[in-house]
Amino acid sequence: MDRKLEIIQCARELIEERGLAKTSVAAITERMNVARTLFYHYFPSKEDLVAAVLDTYVDEFIASLKEWNAQRVEGDIEGALDTIVALIRDQLFDNDNAHKPFRRALATHENASLYLQFINRVADASATYIVETTVADYGRLHEVRIDHAYETFYMLILGIVGYMRQHPEASDDVLKDIIAQTLHFEREREQSHHTA
């Protein structure tokens, strides 16, 4: 592993152990037993390093999204909705997940800017991936009845995540309905008549 990746990994471990506020450049270089000049050779500031750490979490989310996409059953809209809501809950909100300290740090007012960076990166990468794969697959079987697919998915992702953050008690059925209605999916009426 090259030194830059080692610094990112060390910072990530410290953030998960101590939280973001208690992870300093000094703590990182001390744990790695390297000079601060090496840190600054790769990262002009702690903020630049935090951005690189955020990218590792985004990459993991996208890897989970790719796995979800590979396991989707062609034509099974209900199954896809069930599993995507579960994926979002697990990857972004499950406090029993291994990234609990990082998620807790993101949820504080102190880190509101960091949260916005993270969620915008997730929305961008997810929307890009979904449009290039899932929407293309769907379009082979159904009419895609949304214009501006990337922008629609970007806004849907931001909206769903923001809503779930504010309303963690929201039922999966409501979340599935919001997704299906936004994307104009044809669903079985008996399965999609839930009220908000």
Briefly describe each language-model feature range:
Residues D2-R3:
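Short, Lys/Arg-enriched anionic-surface-contact patches
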Residues H99-K100, V135-T182, Q191-A196:
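Hydrophobic/aromatic-rich alpha-helical bundle segments in the mid-to-C-terminal region
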Residues E6, L14-D48, A52:
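Helix-turn-helix
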Residues K66, E110-Y138, D147-E151:
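Amphipathic alpha-helical packing segments from all-alpha helical-bundle domains
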Residues D55-I62:
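Short, basic, alpha-helical segments at the C-terminal edge of helix-turn-helix-like DNA-binding modules
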Residues D90-S113, G162, Q166:
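Amphipathic alpha-helical segments used for helix-helix packing
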Residues A52, K66-D94, Y150-F153, D172, ...:
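Hydrophobic alpha-helical connector segments
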Residues I7-I15, Y57, I88:
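Short hydrophobic clusters on alpha-helical segments that form packing/core surfaces
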